[in-house]
């Protein structure tokens, strides 16, 4: 009889604790999750600029209207691709015989990388944990970027040396 009462008491306590924890979790709005969920989606690149420290003017290595998308998934995956507003006028056959300076290509025509991401809402920092892409020196690194979310606009910028502006498309 005592075993039955103890078993019943244990079962009641366990069920009460589980119900109480679920009720608290479901009734509480998690501000951090809400902010991170606003980042999830596909963002179209509309500006990619760097400050020329000699002239003090912003330069647009990929042109005034760069092409590209940044995608952040619910599962924590990031994928980004950037290319210049004008492509290199070359055929596939000609490309086989052309020598290309990799740095010039990457910094003037096209690059991309992928991996996972994490967000520190309190510091407004998004970190891209790069696992692959066209920038070999980024692979297996953490690329921290300050960001601001304003409605459907994502600004990734340190407000000093670089500025990347994107609008949400999905």
Model-based region annotation:
Residues 18-170:
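Lipid interaction determinants
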Residues 5-13:
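Sec-dependent N-terminal signal peptides
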Residues 1-2:
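N-terminal secretory signal peptides that target proteins for export/translocation
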């Amino acid at each position: 009889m005592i075993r039955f009462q103890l078993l019943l008491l244990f079962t009641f306590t366990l069920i009460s604790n589980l119900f109480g924890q679920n009720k608290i979790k479901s009734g509480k709005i998690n501000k951090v999750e809400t902010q991170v969920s606003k980042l999830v989606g596909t963002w179209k690149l509309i500006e990619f600029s760097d400050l020329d420290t000699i002239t003090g003017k912003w330069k647009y290595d990929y042109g005034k209207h760069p092409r590209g998308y940044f995608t952040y998934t619910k599962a924590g995956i990031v994928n980004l691709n950037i290319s210049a507003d004008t492509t290199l006028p070359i055929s596939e056959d000609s490309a086989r015989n052309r020598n290309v300076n990799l740095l010039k290509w990457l910094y003037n025509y096209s690059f991309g990388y992928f991996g996972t991401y994490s967000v520190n809402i309190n510091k407004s920092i998004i970190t891209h944990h790069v696992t692959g892409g066209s920038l070999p020196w980024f692979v297996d690194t953490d690329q921290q970027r300050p960001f601001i979310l304003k409605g459907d606009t994502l600004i990734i910028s340190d407000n000093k040396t670089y500025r990347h502006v994107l609008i949400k498309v999905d």
